[in-house]
Amino acid sequence: MKQRTGWTVVLCAAVAVLLAAAQQSDVIIKIEKGERAVIALPDLRGSGEAQQYMDAFNQTLWNDIDSAGIFRLVPKSLYWLQVPRQPQDFRPQPASPPNATSNVRPNAQGLWLSDWAGPPVSADYLAFGYTGVDSRQIVLRGWLYNARQSGASNAQVFGKTYLAPLGEDGARKIAHEFAADILQQFGAVSLSGTKIYFVGERARGMKEIWSIDPDGSREKQLTFYKSLSITPAASPDGTRLAFCSFAHGSPGIFVQSLETGRRLSFYNESSPLTATPEFTPDGKQILFASSVTGWAQIYIANLDGSGMRRVTYSRSIDMEPKVNPKTGSEIAFISDRSGMPQIYRMNMEGADVQRLTSGEGEAVNPAWDPAGQHIAFSWTKGYAPGHYNVFVMDVATRQFVQLTHDAGRNEHPSWAPDGRHIVFSSNRSGSLQIWTMLADGTQLKQLTTQGRNTQPVLGK
């Protein structure tokens, strides 16, 4: 029993917390593999009341394009003094470009498209436009131009008008939409419209569920139980949040509406432990771990907790069920049936159990990618207990790659809908915070700074 209790502490963050608490266009521009298109994103200006919201607009646009990981953004310090607001601002291309000492373009550099393609900017693409106000709406007219085209008349990739309620939220909304349309031209998916749900600790001994946008904006507290609320999971349609809470004493599953903020009905069988909820891809059922019969086992139930059915039948601790989002027919989970926590998979009936990780250290926190072909997970891989790093495994070949290296504790990976980004928690900056990175381990970005934050999951 002593051995199992010690293992439980390191099985997963969920159990550790419990023990501690007890204590437009169809044309896609193709970029060759390994290359990144260079894009210039000069600050757009607004007229009238729109101008006061342009800082939020420009920062949001920059963050969305930068975080996509498919562009190299030109530093704004290299941009020309004059930025076109609309296509009509471009000057006719001269027959031959002037040399560096020419006065052909006095005080007008930037109004020739070739200015943006040549040094020091050297951009492949230029995004520009302007905003104004109409009937209490902020209006953006935005364009994307191919700066390598000879002449502005042939350079337009797309131009579009965007509308949103006047205000900072509206400015962010049209920036997200403009960025999404830019990314769409290159076959990339914008993360705008998604949310990161996580466990935030702002007061000692109290953990609540919070949300934040993928660009680090609009951080918001969602639960107020003044207790421990952990292991969040978002429903596929973005209407429900499931999590484990100590609010009523014993840890149980709570389900909360993301539309109203109200708690929804969910029946919990009497059990010392009920945790790690996960919605099925169709959003009709919830999987979770419960110790109602002794050791924690995996169960599945309806959204209100009815129809509870046991899935695993081991004399071990089985937790953290994650359903393949593509097939909906297999579950990845963690178990100590081989001695230390490892990742396994099985079908929805609990049969055809296969071990995926090697046993060289503790492997926890499995997370399927949207295509259902890879699993991100946390692994000590020979290090001392607790020193986790994030890995990604190809499920078919069992080959894996390490994404984080020698930078503290890195755990709880979760995939973004685009399959290109991973959100995770790390204490590399001192305390546990929420970070994002590309799925190759590059372009790391810290999203949270206050308190301690962990167990992130992506949802709508």
Kindly give the residue locations of the regions a language model identified:
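Short loop/turn segments that connect beta-strands within beta-propeller blades
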Residues: 213-217, 257-261, 302-306, 347-351, ...
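Amphipathic beta-strand/beta-sheet edge segments enriched in Tyr/Trp
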Residues: 89-181
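Short beta-strand->alpha-helix linker/helix-N-cap micro-motif
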Residues: 28-112, 130
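Residue-level detector of Asp-centered blade-edge/turn motifs that repeat once per structural unit
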Residues: 190-192, 236-237, 281-282, 325-327, ...
